[in-house]
């Protein structure tokens, strides 16, 4: 990845199940957003596709060479299913899982090795368009290259075959439970292939739904019609009446809302329902994760990328949901600071991210020296979790020094907060 936001250059590999750990502003969200630019089916429909702040240090034109500085992001999707191999048959390459590299010019026999599998290489290219004074970008297959040096476009229907779903922290509960394009409910309807007739059926019902037919509103609309007829022919403003909306699919997508029971009862004994946005934060997040589980069951291969899945969820729910999504998905990528989430992953499945001068590195965690797996799991929350998430470590001789240093740090923060933070 070259030139994305806070990251100038990186090369990160993810195992099939992993958690990205690191300090705040290390680039975890930037990394997932970069992959979303390549694999997200609805991402390129956003306008503009990229903006000034997506370029490293905001530099999209080299001040010395006066040349446009591009954003280039390449993603290798390995472990393709049989269906995916058939669909992407013209773009297949071979990935060596042991060497962590693509086979180049290898004899055909090497592709039969157990650690070698079909893969696909795609990339995003974004740039500043000088003539239009705007930003552009698109996604392409890395192979094959056409005779004129260009590349075939990697389209939204092709991206849906990859099954990549990215849930940002801020997105959870805002539009995931709506029917807007790219929302989780929209993805489920597409997978169930029920969207073709659903919208037309809803429009037919709304066209026949009487709205505003009380006597007062009827008199008002009749007065409007009479007033208009003084100036224009009668057929220009015939029969004014009200509908719940302008009766278009896009309006329905924006306005249809999921209601849920609140547990409160109305005077007539019926259960009072409210829009899902009025539910508790933990309830909304659990609903979103439940929708992800449905998608995983409907789709053969799903790649989940999720930020902070533990927000507003109790520890036992965090564990249950994380394990469920890992079992049902082809690949699950999380970013989390929760010890209850981190302890569900083996050290090799925790990728520790660091960013120095715009260069990002990712290193799989390993068992500490002389620490056995049983002791690691037993003491993870009290001893090892903070070491994974901290920027630096201070090794002390014993518990007395540890407690004394922590107390001194708190006291310094109270006495001189501007000097000691």
Spans of model-derived segments:
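Extended helical coiled-coil dimerization/tether regions that scaffold
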Residues: 176-179, 188-287, 291-303
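Switch/communication elements of ASCE P-loop NTPase nucleotide-binding domains
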Residues: 1-40, 259-386, 393, 402-410
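Short helix-loop-beta junction
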Residues: 408-421
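Short glycine-/polar-rich loops that comprise or flank the Walker A/P-loop
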Residues: 69-73, 118-122, 160-164, 300-301, ...
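Membrane-embedded alpha-helical bundles of multi-pass transporters/translocases
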Residues: 13-66, 70-74
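Flexible glycine-/small-residue-rich
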Residues: 75-79, 168-171, 246, 260-262, ...
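Glycine-rich phosphate-binding loops of NTPases
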Residues: 45-70, 80-204, 266-274
């Amino acid at each position: 990845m070259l030139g994305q936001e806070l990251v100038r250059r990186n090369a990160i590999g993810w195992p099939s199940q992993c958690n990205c750990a690191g300090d705040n502003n290390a680039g975890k969200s930037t990394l997932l957003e970069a992959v979303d630019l390549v694999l997200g089916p609805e991402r390129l429909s956003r306008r503009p596709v990229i903006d000034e702040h997506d370029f490293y240090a905001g530099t999209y034109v080299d001040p010395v060479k006066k040349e446009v500085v591009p954003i280039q992001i390449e993603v290798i999707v390995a472990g393709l299913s049989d269906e995916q191999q058939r669909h992407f048959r013209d773009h297949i390459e071979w990935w060596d899982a042991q060497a962590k590299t693509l086979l180049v010019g290898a004899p055909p026999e090497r592709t039969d090795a157990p650690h070698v599998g079909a893969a696909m290489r795609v990339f995003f290219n974004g740039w500043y368009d000088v003539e239009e004074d705007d930003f552009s970008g698109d996604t392409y297959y890395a192979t094959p290259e056409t005779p004129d040096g260009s590349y075939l476009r990697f389209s939204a229907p092709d991206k849906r075959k990859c099954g990549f779903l990215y849930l940002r922290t801020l997105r959870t509960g805002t539009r995931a439970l709506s029917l807007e394009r790219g929302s989780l409910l929209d993805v489920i309807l597409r997978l169930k292939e029920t969207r073709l007739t659903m919208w037309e059926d809803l429009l037919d019902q709304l066209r026949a739904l009487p709205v505003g037919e009380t006597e007062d509103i009827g008199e008002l609309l009749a007065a409007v019609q009479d007033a208009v007829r003084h100036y224009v022919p009668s057929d220009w403003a015939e029969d004014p009446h009200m509908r719940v909306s302008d009766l278009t699919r896009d309006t329905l997508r924006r306005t249809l809302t999921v209601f849920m029971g609140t547990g409160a009862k109305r005077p007539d004994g019926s259960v009072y329902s409210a829009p899902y946005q009025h539910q508790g934060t933990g309830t909304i997040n659990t609903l979103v994760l439940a929708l992800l589980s449905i998608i995983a069951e409907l789709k053969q291969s799903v790649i989940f990328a999720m930020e902070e899945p533990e927000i507003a969820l109790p520890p036992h729910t965090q564990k249950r949901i994380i394990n469920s999504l890992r079992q049902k998905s082809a690949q699950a990528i999380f970013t989390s600071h929760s010890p209850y989430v981190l302890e569900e992953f083996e050290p090799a499945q925790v990728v520790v991210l660091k960013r120095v001068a715009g260069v990002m590195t990712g290193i799989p965690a390993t068992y500490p020296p002389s620490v056995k797996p049983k002791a690691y799991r037993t003491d993870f929350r009290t001893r090892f979790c903070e070491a994974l998430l901290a920027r630096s470590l201070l090794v002390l001789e014993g518990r007395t020094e540890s407690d004394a240093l922590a107390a001194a740090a708190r006291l310094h923060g109270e006495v001189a907060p501007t000097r000691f933070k």
